[in-house]
Amino acid sequence: MIHLFCLSRYRLYVKINKKVIKMLNRQKNDYYFNIFLNLARAMYMQLEKDWDKEAKLCGISYAQQHALWLLHVQDGLTLEELGNIAIWNKSTTSALISRLEKKGLVEKRKDEGSRLIRIYLTEEGYKKIDESTNTKECIEYMGLFKDKEEEDVVRVLSLMKELVDEIHQGKNPDFNTFINEYSQN
């Protein structure tokens, strides 16, 4: 009788401990996610602020600079591909490209034998990218990883990509293709 009581008490203890462990794991996961979210937001907000300041010195907006940079990396994107990679909606992407086209920084070309229209940097667009990324601040930002061990950089970037993949869950194939191709270079 005492033996059965101890056994059932042990089962209750194990059941309670599993609940406590599950609760603690949930709290730990919530804590890590909160830290991740705040770090990601802080990094994004500061980078956007600084890149916007640099872009304005060159007479373009942060979004325009971002579009030019994406086209510099992968020229000939369609409006849809560019919007998906930059995570912009169609109207934002279209308006942005129209403004860049008026400034003579990009041009649209129709694919031969297709209805697709692709966007390409003009000579002026390439010059604007050079101008907007050759400032002291931009060079410092782009050199963030120069003093880091390559395996640490690869590990951090791989983890970030893994997290983005989990968040996107395959919802943005253009973004995934761009990141995969860019990370191969």
Model-predicted segments: where are they?
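Charged, amphipathic alpha-helical coiled-coil/dimerization segments
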Residues: 99-155
